Amino acid sequence: MAAGDLLLRTQSGLPVLARAFPSCLCLRVPARRRRGAPPLTAAKVDVADAVGRRVRSGGAAVPKRRRSRRDAEEEEEEGLAFSRVVTGRGRGVREEGVAEGEAPEFDAAKSGDESGGVDGSYLSDTRFDQCTISPLSLKAVKDAGYERMTQVQEATLPVILQGKDVLAKAKTGTGKTVAFLLPAIEVLSALPNSRRDQLRPSINLLVMCPTRELAIQVAVEAKKLLKYHRSLGVQVVIGGTRLTQEQRSMQANPCQILVATPGRLKDHVENTPGFSTRLKGVKVLVLDEADRLLDMGFRRDIERIIASVPKERQTLLFSATVPEEVRQISHIAMKKNYKFINTVKDGDEETHAQVSQMFMIAPLDLHFSILYDVLKKHVAEDADYKVIIFCTTAMVTKLVAEILSQLRLNIREIHSRKSQSARTKVSDEFRKSRGLILVSSDVSARGVDYPDVTLVIQVGVPADRQQYIHRLGRTGRKGKEGQGLLLLAPWEKYFLSSIKDLSISEATVPSVDSSTQTIVKDAVRKVEMRSKECAYQAWLGYYNSNKTIGREKSRLVKLAEEFSQSMELSVPPAIPKQILRKMGLNNVPGLRST
């Protein structure tokens, strides 16, 4: 027995060796087992409790750190969750179990679909067996159900395999994840075994993603491609999780491939012993959805990470758009002779042709009733309905989900205030199911594939044109038809000028009868006051940051009062003075403070 092992017995006396890893419990049962011995399921709770106490008291020591502004911001935006570890190490690729309260188990074989979320219109005529990849990778690719390469993969894979730095302009849903993972895995598999088999190997492939959902999705894809690369492993470190849990997981299950969100990656560089040393082995650095990484304010973190990895490396940037800021970071991160590969055809970066786009302009106090009416009709017309409703903020998302749940619609919600385990569970359920309505903030706008979405509704003005397009892109995928509806208040109509070149037309606002309005208002009244207070504060913050609407503060206050009235409140909620100061709204007449 090794340190940390426990010798347990079932009720019939069968000896079981339990090895406690920081994030899991492995049970080893002797090969010779008495006939009729009882299963271990009844003893699982006691075993988990015993090992949990041991791990908590004897886990690896990690340094305490000061709570940074980044922590506070991530908790505010991302919520709290637990870490997730995906491993593909050793014989028989497996996934480590997770303790109670952590993110639920997910399996590469069960996540997504066989086509990897790729629209068939993006497939090329080139097969994977026609390119120079190893037999192990080719076998994994075939097992994953991939036969033909997408146009993005066809254009980028040969160049990346030559070892060149690449800036690729590529839309989500076009196979870009495999486009950077497959050649990177080829680089890693060619490294000397001594570099890959050591107890704590260097991190050789580092992938940075803007969101937790995308990071998990990339790791799942990597796990598929690593199926026959027995000595390579992948892990995920993501914002909003327990740093100490991730530190212990990386000690117990060292990996060569790390997928991370930038803020959490920076945390590990600053607070995890030996982590910076492991980054010195990075051979390939990937920035996935580089434009969104920069839009979310991660530039400083990215620059620090770039400074932490070797200069002699291969760098890959994949981005749906290539604005000036992406070009600036490419000059910092990449060699001067990098290749720019544009896989987006003129006009193709816009919405899918199969999506019917409509907008409605209606007073704010009718939005909930109109939303309910539209959903009822869509559910009645399509038995296989699958709807995503995008809201402006996480707390407004929560409010809308609670109202629609009161109206007895089949609702799921996903946003940054949900724990990672809850988000993963909802995301997996929505991906695999039909007959569901997902109310979401922008965590689902890009990089996450949900097949067969029949309708996308955007409630409130999007932040910009690109956000509108990316949200709409959740439907009309793989050549299938879809519908999009943008629901705006009269004072949000200005946004239409930014999408006037798209095929969008005005829809007639439904005349919601008085009985339906009464039902909806009753549902709104049943929502807890705390949810309304949080939604009001978040709504005010969102529109205050809008350059058009937030410019005139007195008008903004009146609009916020309209939103408050739509929640069936006679008086707008009070907001803490500290929050108002941060918004620049302290001493603005009409706002109540605490």
Swiss-Prot record:
It comes from the Eukaryota. This is DEAD-box ATP-dependent RNA helicase 25. The Q motif is unique to and characteristic of the DEAD box family of RNA helicases and controls ATP binding and hydrolysis. Belongs to the DEAD box helicase family. Its EC number is 3.6.4.13. A motif (Q motif) lies at residues 126-154. Keywords: ATP-binding, Helicase, Hydrolase, Nucleotide-binding, RNA-binding. GO terms for molecular function: ATP binding; ATP hydrolysis activity; RNA binding; RNA helicase activity.
